[in-house]
Regions:
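General beta-strand recognition
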Residues: 34-35, 45, 62, 89, ...
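Residue-level recognition of conserved beta-strand positions in structured domain cores
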Residues: 38, 48, 65-67, 92, ...
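Short, conserved beta-strand element in jelly-roll/cupin
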Residues: 48-63
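Ligand-binding loop in jelly-roll beta-barrel domains
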Residues: 83-104
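Conserved short histidine dyad/triad with adjacent acidic residue
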Residues: 27-49, 81-84
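A short, N-terminal "cap"/entry segment at the start of jelly-roll beta-barrel domains
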Residues: 1-32
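Short acidic-glycine-tyrosine-enriched beta hairpin
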Residues: 38, 68-88
Length: 104
């Protein structure tokens, strides 16, 4: 889905890693929310509170989920899931455009 209807958008950016990763939170009428963001090339580690679906809409990266030993290559149009109360490492090879869905 490339368009979201009937949402509210928080104008304040979520800023991580000295501005190298930024996102905006969108909230749906049912109270669910997602973040839409941009990640500059680099290596990052993210922790999760809730389970997440990370959709890479553009770009090229490698990810390593907590507890795994094999890096996975993810390109634009692909996605991956992260468990709640977990973490993942990501190596953004190019600028990454992403959509993160929080699963409760």
């Amino acid at each position: 889905m490339s368009d979201f209807k009937e949402v509210s958008i928080n104008r304040a950016a979520n800023v991580y890693f000295d501005g190298k990763v930024t996102s905006r939170t969108i909230t749906f009428a049912d109270g669910s929310f997602k973040t839409l963001g941009i990640m500059q090339a680099g290596d990052y580690n993210f922790g999760t509170n809730e389970a997440e679906l990370m959709e890479i809409t553009a770009g090229d990266c490698e990810i390593l989920l907590a507890g795994e030993t094999e890096w996975q290559t993810i390109i634009g149009g692909q996605s991956f899931n992260v468990d709640a109360n977990s973490s993942f490492d990501i190596k953004a090879k190019t600028i990454i455009d992403y959509c993160c869905t929080y699963i409760s």
